[in-house]
Curated annotation (Swiss-Prot):
It is found in: Secreted. Its main location: secreted. This is Feruloyl esterase A. Belongs to the AB hydrolase superfamily. FaeA family. Involved in degradation of plant cell walls. Hydrolyzes the feruloyl-arabinose ester bond in arabinoxylans as well as the feruloyl-galactose and feruloyl-arabinose ester bonds in pectin. Active against methyl esters of sinapate (MSA), but not caffeate (MCA).
Length: 49
């Protein structure tokens, strides 16, 4: 299926945004795992619920 013009641009931007968000969640998960391993309370900005 071929998309053209603006819709293709929009699709590419959405994919890029999703990739960035996914990477951010992965970084956060790694940060939380390291915090748990270290036994520290960690940064309040990343506090668990």
């Amino acid at each position: 299926a071929s998309t053209q013009g603006i819709s293709e641009d929009l699709y590419n931007r959405l994919v890029e945004m999703a990739t960035i968000i996914q990477a951010a969640y992965a970084d956060l998960a790694i940060y939380n795992a390291q915090t748990d391993i270290n036994g520290a309370s960690g940064n309040q900005a990343f506090a668990s619920y």
